[in-house]
Amino acid sequence: MEIIKSNIANLPSRFGKFQIKSYKEGCCKEHLTIFSPNLDVTKTVNVRIHSECLTGDAIGSLKCDCRDQLEASLKYINKHGGMVIYLRQEGRNIGLLNKVNAYALQDNGLDTIEANHQLGFKADERTYEIVDFILKDFGIKSINLLTNNPLKLASLTCVNIEKRIPIEIESNEFNKDYLKVKKEQMGHMLDEFTR
């Protein structure tokens, strides 16, 4: 599959001054890297892989912790250096329309995994080959991965993962069950639900 790369541009944001570079995968998926202007790829780089969540990232949905994780990651990268890789994989890669349908099923009592299965999808449809491509493109060989997701830890093949940096957000009344399912059924490393 052909991947087209953009130039690098500056991006001042409310979280700090960053640079950005975009990658177009095939005809449709455009991913974004947000990184420190002084990124040193000869050292271990702090990396967050964040999958798009329009309802959380843009609208502030309380049904997930996506926006809070993204904002915490950008603050961390601003302070410590590194990169956020923003993947266009809405709804764990089932797309926005199917995600809304999954939300409707959840409104009727199914959990996030049951809803995906009801729609004919796996619990998590995401893949991370593009992340390997991006890390290679930057020349990054060693990372600290900001994640709670064991699938992300297991999926990266082109780099050495020095350590996992947890990025936990306290649950609320709307996402507590969702996060508990991620912990109990998907193996997410969430300390709140181990106490």
Swiss-Prot record:
GO terms for biological process: riboflavin biosynthetic process. Catalyzes the conversion of GTP to 2,5-diamino-6-ribosylamino-4(3H)-pyrimidinone 5'-phosphate (DARP), formate and pyrophosphate. GO terms for cellular component: cytosol. InterPro entries: GTP_cyclohydro_II, RibA, RibA-like_sf. The active site is at residues 124, 126. Belongs to the GTP cyclohydrolase II family. Its EC number is 3.5.4.25. Its cofactor is Zn(2+). The keyword Metal-binding applies. GO terms for molecular function: GTP binding; GTP cyclohydrolase II activity; zinc ion binding. Zn(2+) binds at residues 53, 64, 66. Keywords: GTP-binding, Hydrolase, Metal-binding, Nucleotide-binding, Riboflavin biosynthesis, Zinc. CDD domains: GTP_cyclohydro2. It catalyses: GTP + 4 H2O = 2,5-diamino-6-hydroxy-4-(5-phosphoribosylamino)-pyrimidine + formate + 2 phosphate + 3 H(+). Binds 1 zinc ion per subunit. Pathway: Cofactor biosynthesis; riboflavin biosynthesis; 5-amino-6-(D-ribitylamino)uracil from GTP: step 1/4. GTP binds at residues 48-52, 69, 90-92, 112, 147, 152. This is GTP cyclohydrolase-2.
